[in-house]
Regions:
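Gly/Ser-rich, low-complexity
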Residues: 1-104, 109-127, 143-156, 160, ...
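Hydrophobic alpha-helical transmembrane segments of multi-pass integral membrane proteins
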Residues: 99-110, 130-138, 164-175, 203-214, ...
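Membrane interface segments of multi-pass transport proteins and intramembrane proteases
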Residues: 116-120, 219-235, 333-342
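Small-residue-enriched core segments of transmembrane alpha-helices in multipass membrane transport
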Residues: 125-136, 156-164, 193-199, 230-244, ...
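Extended, low-complexity, charged alpha-helical tracts
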Residues: 159-166, 170, 331-335, 339
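Loop-centered beta-sheet repeat module
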Residues: 184-248
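Helical hairpin unit composed of two closely spaced alpha helices linked by a short loop
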Residues: 298-339
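Interfacial loop-to-transmembrane junctions
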Residues: 336-356
Length: 381
C-alpha cells in the first residue's frame, strides 16, 4: 500500500508541474488592460475636437505608441509640419482684413492733410467717419477672435471631460485610490470653474476693455484709459489667483494622497508575501501588474499632454497671428496717420495679448494637474 500512495503522489506532482499552463508576460498584461479601459470615448472626443490631425492619430494609438516605444513612437516631423502649415494658413486668412484697415488709414491720412487746410471742422468730421468705419472692422475681427478663443477653450474642456474618468480609472487600477479621487475632484473642478469664468468674467471683461480702448481714442484727450487699465489688471489678477490656487491644491494633494496610497498598497503586498508557499509568487505577480498599470497610466498622461498641445495650437496660432498683425499695422500707420488710429489698433493688439494669456493659463492648469498626479503616482511598491 505504501508504494501505491507514493505512485499516486508522484502522478499528482508530475501532473501539476508538467501540465502546460498559459503564462502572461508584461506585454500581455498591458494589452489586456488596454482593452478593458475602453478608450473609445476619449478617441471620439479627440476626433470631434481636433481638426486636421497629423497622421490621423487617435488617443489610443498615442498611448500604445508611448507604451511600446516611448517618445520615439510619436513622429516629431509630422507634428512640426502640422504646426507650420497651420501657422501660415492663419496668416493667409487674416491678411485681407488688415490690408483693408491699412488702406483706409493711409487714404484718410492723405486726404486729411488736404482737408485740414480747408476747415478744422470738416477734418474732424472726416476723422469720425473714417474712425467709425475702421472701428467696425476692428470690432468685427475681434468678435471672430472671441469666437476662436471660446471655441478653443470649449474643445479643451470637452476633451478633458472625456479623459478625466478614464485616467481616474487607470489610477484606481494602479493602486492609487486616494490619488484617483483627488484628481477626479480637482480636474472636474477646474473644468467647471473655467467654463464659468470664460462665460461671465474673461470674455465679457476683454470685450469691455476693447470697447473702452476704442472709445477712449475717439477723443483727442484720454478720458477712459484708466478705466480700461482697471479691467486689464483685474483680468490678469484673476488669472494669477486661479493659477496659484490650482498649483497649491495640486501640490498638497500630490504630497498627501500618493503617500497614503503607497502605505496601503505596501501593506497589501506584505500581506500577500506573508502567505506560506505562494506568498513570493503572489508578490511578484502583484508587482508585475502594478508596473504594467503604472506604465499605461504614465503613457496616458503623456498622450493627454500631447493632445492638449494639439488642441491649443489652432486657437493660439490664430490669436497670435491677429496679435502680430495688429501690432504691425499700428507700427506701419504711426508715421502717416492720426495718432489715435494707430493707438486704437495697438489697443486691439493688447486685447489679443490678453486672450493669449487666458488660453495659456487654461492649458497650463490642465498641464500642471496631469503632470503632478502622473509624477507623484509613478512608483512601484
Amino acid at each position: 500500500m505504501v508504494w501505491v500512495k507514493k505512485s499516486v503522489a508522484m502522478i499528482l506532482f508530475l501532473g501539476i508541474f508538467l501540465m502546460p499552463q498559459t503564462v502572461y508576460a508584461a506585454e500581455d498584461y498591458m494589452d489586456e488592460m488596454m482593452q478593458k479601459l475602453k478608450l473609445d470615448e476619449v478617441d471620439d472626443a479627440m476626433e470631434k475636437n481636433v481638426t486636421q490631425l497629423p497622421d490621423k492619430y487617435t488617443f489610443s494609438d498615442m498611448v500604445q505608441s508611448f507604451v511600446a516605444e516611448g517618445t520615439d513612437g510619436i513622429s516629431r516631423d509630422n507634428i512640426c509640419d502640422y504646426v507650420f502649415d497651420l501657422f501660415f494658413y492663419e496668416i493667409a486668412a487674416v491678411k485681407p482684413l488688415f490690408i483693408q484697415i491699412i488702406s483706409m488709414s493711409i487714404l484718410f491720412a492723405f486726404f486729411g492733410k488736404l482737408l485740414v487746410t480747408k476747415s478744422q471742422y470738416v477734418s474732424e468730421m472726416s476723422f469720425f467717419v473714417v474712425y467709425t468705419g475702421i472701428m467696425l472692422l476692428l470690432l468685427q475681427s475681434f468678435q471672430l477672435i472671441s469666437e476662436v478663443v471660446e471655441s478653443g477653450i470649449g474643445k479643451t474642456t470637452s476633451f478633458m471631460t472625456a479623459f478625466i474618468p478614464t485616467y481616474a480609472t487607470t489610477l484606481l487600477l494602479s493602486g492609487n485610490t486616494a490619488s484617483a479621487g483627488s484628481f477626479y475632484g480637482l480636474a472636474f473642478g477646474i473644468v467647471y470653474v473655467l467654463e464659468l469664468a470664460m462665460k461671465f468674467l474673461f470674455i465679457p471683461g476683454v470685450h469691455i476693455y476693447v470697447l473702452l480702448v476704442l472709445l477712449d481714442h475717439l477723443f483727442e484727450e484720454s478720458k477712459l484709459s484708466k478705466f480700461a487699465e482697471l479691467f486689464e489688471s483685474g483680468i490678469y489678477l484673476a488669472l494669477k489667483v486661479g493659477l496659484a490656487v490650482v498649483m497649491g491644491m495640486g501640490v498638497v494633494q500630490s504630497l498627501i494622497a500618493p503617500a497614503k496610497d503607497r502605505l496601503s498598497v505596501s501593506s497589501l503586498y506584505q500581506g500577500f508575501k506573508a502567505v506560506p508557499g505562494v506568498g513570493n509568487s503572489c508578490g511578484a505577480a502583484g508587482e508585475l501588474l502594478g508596473g504594467c498599470t503604472i506604465m499605461i497610466k504614465n503613457s496616458m498622461g503623456a498622450a493627454a499632454l500631447l493632445v492638449l498641445v494639439i488642441l491649443g495650437l489652432e486657437p493660439v496660432l490664430k490669436v497670435l497671428c491677429f496679435h502680430v498683425m495688429y501690432r504691425l499695422a499700428s507700427a506701419v500707420l504711426q508715421p502717416f496717420c492720426d495718432k489715435r488710429l494707430a493707438e486704437s489698433i495697438a489697443g486691439m493688439g493688447k486685447g489679443c495679448g490678453i486672450y493669449l494669456k487666458i488660453m495659456w493659463n487654461a492649458l497650463l492648469l490642465f498641464f500642471l494637474t496631469i503632470s503632478m498626479i502622473a509624477a507623484s503616482t509613478g512608483f512601484i511598491n
